[in-house]
């Protein structure tokens, strides 16, 4: 697999001799659309009816196919205040965008994140806000279903 990020909000890769490209398009202030284009006739889209503050990729599951990692701002059933959340989407059957993990929270309220691809296992490094107002940096790894706190 070869993967590169050539422009903001767009990345592409080769896997099994197939070319794939993922992009994020802003349709309005509260509607973003993830597009998956392949060298096949199929085209997959996933609508995000929330503001997006971050868009990245990385093979967090270790299966050889990059996942799409998106930071959205939205409320949840148990936390009605709109806040920053972390969503992870997988590429199913090398053709379709599907949710893998729609995280309502990490350990503390999320401020920002970055995907760390330098390690053998891809990590998600977050900046989180403590109740005291201080910030902490944490690293998470994929553990079957969901993110597991690896280091602070």
Where are these regions (language model features)?
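Beta-propeller-forming repeat regions
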Residues: 2-152
């Amino acid at each position: 697999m070869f993967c590169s990020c050539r422009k903001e909000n767009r990345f592409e890769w080769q896997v099994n001799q197939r070319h794939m490209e993922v992009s994020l398009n802003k349709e309005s202030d509260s509607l973003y659309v993830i597009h998956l284009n392949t060298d096949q006739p199929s085209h997959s889209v996933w609508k995000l009816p929330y503001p997006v503050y971050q868009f990245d990729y990385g093979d967090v599951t270790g299966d050889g196919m990059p996942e799409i990692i998106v930071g959205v701002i939205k409320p949840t059933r148990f936390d009605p205040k709109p806040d920053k959340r972390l969503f992870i989407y997988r590429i199913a059957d090398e053709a379709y965008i599907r949710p893998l993990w729609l995280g309502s929270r990490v350990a503390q309220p999320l401020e920002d994140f970055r995907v760390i691809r330098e390690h053998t296992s891809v990590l998600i490094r977050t900046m989180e806000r403590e109740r005291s107002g201080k910030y902490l940096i944490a690293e998470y790894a994929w553990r079957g279903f969901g993110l597991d706190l690896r280091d602070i």
